[in-house]
Amino acid sequence: LGVPADHISVYPGSGTPLDLVTVAFTSPKGSLVTADPTYEQAWRTSQRVGAKLIKVPQRKDFSHDVEAMCAADPNAGMIYICNPNNPTGGINLRKDIEYAAKNKPAGSILVVDEAYIHFSDNAVSAADLCASGESVVVLRTFSKLYGMAGLRLGYAVGSPANLAKMNGGSGRSQGVVAMTTIGAGIASLTDEKLVPSRRAMIKKGRTETITWLEKQGYACTISEANCFMVDVKRPGRQFQADMATHGVNIGRTWAGFENWPRISVGTEAEMKRFRDAFTAVMAGQLGAITPQTRQRAALELPGSQLQRASFVDEQAYRMPLHTSC
């Protein structure tokens, strides 16, 4: 990462530091500025502390419009960039992140959420900016590509002063991380083949699936993550329910993008099943699975199979745990 050890604070996942930094830097006098759509956790947290929420539409290439975000409110307390973005998978290049760091409102902090960065070929980490005098905090997690969502491991990168403010003035991070979780994280970091192999698998599945959808006439977001959005030309929630009748669970929709559900990318076999179900649903053919039969089937499955019964959405939860830990 290129930062001193005192610039890193470990947490049980990256959701905890996202809450902490939002509480620390937004208020009724300091707004939260984000892209739209994006990951909503900071939206909810900022509203709990009474901060104004400003959503800035993304560019046509589904990247964050950093110029508009920096100009959105001179009293902004925090600018949040999810890079790559959840749910679109769009990325911002390094020049955009540097622009935001230099041009954000005085007194504000730039938070770059890099939960999905390991899936990207072109997104560059902003972690080094945290040690260069910029008011930047970077968030990372082991819940996505590393497949450790259940173990809960993440960290924040920032100046000691910013980390202390996040942690309530304390030099200690908030939350408890188990030693077994730390061991799993270390094992994953020492496996040099882990990131490139999983990135390649997801990229192949993502490219093939998006190409297939676009050939059928369905627009998709430009993605470098393990997810993307697709315009199904109908209410996304109903489409989600129809796909579930074939045993395929897809992601949710966002306000203003009601016809664009989020799709997570899985293995080759899983994405084939997604395509088969998609074809059937678009032809008006529902499957035999109902909420009742799904519940009965789930009760009969061992835990590992139960996770895979809901296999297309929440890709991170299905990645195999690193076995050398």
Located regions from the model:
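Conserved PLP-binding catalytic core of the aspartate aminotransferase-like
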Residues: 202-203, 212-246, 261, 265, ...
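Phosphate-binding glycine-rich loop
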Residues: 1-31
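Active-site pre-lysine segment of PLP-dependent enzymes
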Residues: 47, 64-75, 87-110, 114-145
